[in-house]
Amino acid sequence: RSDEDKDLMSALYQFGYKSAGFISGFIALLVAARAGWTATFLMVAFVLALSMIGSIIAPEPASSKTPNADRLSFLASLPRRVSTPAVTVVAIGWLIGFVMILVFVMQSLFSATPPSGGTFVRSEGPWIVGLTVLVPAIVSAILVFQFGAKADETPARIANETRAESVLRNLFRAIFDPLMELISRLKWGAVLVLLLALTYRFTDAVWGAFAYPFYLGDQFGALGHSLDDVAIASKFFGVVATILGSLLGAVLIAVLGRMPVFFVGGIVAAATNLLYADLAAGATVLDGFLHISHLGPPLSALADWAAKLSPDVVAADQGQRMARLMVTIFAENIAGGFALVAITAYLTSVVNPRFAAVQYALLASLTMLIGTLGRPWLGEIIESQGYYTVFMITFWLGGVAVVLSILEWVRQARDTS
């Protein structure tokens, strides 16, 4: 594909992604407040059906590569007595991690006394991360540094290959080739890359599961807003803010460079948790900001106008409450869009074009792992200590990514000097 095609496809993807956010968020919440969730899910299902039909009838893109095109791989440089045990160990580790998660899910669904999510994260969480991330990375490092594995051009398909050999080769290429290339190229810098992939979007990964309960609930310091409130503040202003944050991040990367923006993205992503903590604690700081900035009156007037369209009964202080929510969500989504562009640019920069698809998919999937595993633990803290405590915890945990981004910035500066 030409650069023009790639730019067009990227623009179409962003347009579709943001449009989906409006439909599944802003429009869906408005419909739910008026027609109920059944009608809302039917509407979303219809839109998804259109997407499925489009995917089915869309023509396959023409590929410039033949099915048997050569591919860079480390497998040929290793004896079978080394590669087979390596693949077996990692495959067993992934299987054990999957079974641990599956057992917890099944017990949560069907057990008379569901297991504690916090206990699961504290006891099994480190094992899952170790088996699925650390073990493959350590084995890859051993193959590179101890056995001297080198990347060579090998055919994508090998004639007269047995099924066992085919499975071994495909697993090796999917698991080890991307990691071994990173490790052989970056050396110890690969540790920083993996740690950043695991921690940079921790707050985003955690927050998604608790957003609606915090906005709509009335316990543990939740805000008790209506569906219309959330539709306007989160799914309209929030989406607009995400677009603006992404644009700001892209512009600053072009002006300042990748690593300064990456560092700042980690700071703002963590800092916006303090806004939510203040919101959960009564919004003293936010009220002061609205007063000093004179944003309170216009935002309150907008909220009062929107309240007239809502089928729900609104509180007397609806304008002030919505002003707080809109400012907080706008700031958080600006930071989220900014950080998303930063981490995307960073991950794109560290992958090898020959392994780009697999390496980027691997690193991008790691960005949500720690946050996903941390949700049950933080959910229990919400029930015992409230949302304020959780937002303070996520703020401090976000600082880990900030420290790691500084170390990575220094590493890259030394490598280029």
Regions from the language model: what does each represent?
Residues 1, 337-352:
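Intracellular juxtamembrane helix-capping segments at the cytosolic ends
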Residues 2-196, 405-417:
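Intracellular loop-helix junctions on the cytosolic face of multi-pass helical membrane proteins
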Residues 3-12, 227-229, 322, 353-363:
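Loop-to-transmembrane helix entry/capping segments in MFS-fold secondary transporters
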Residues 20-32, 212, 249, 374-382:
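Small-residue (Gly/Pro/Ala) motifs that create kinks and tight helix-helix packing interfaces
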Residues 32, 244-263, 382-383:
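Helix-to-loop junctions at the C-terminal end of transmembrane segments
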Residues 110-122, 196, 200, 209-231:
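Short amphipathic helix-loop junctions that connect adjacent transmembrane helices
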Residues 267-317:
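C-terminal ends and interior cores of transmembrane alpha-helices
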Residues 350-383:
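A late C-terminal transmembrane helix in Major Facilitator Superfamily
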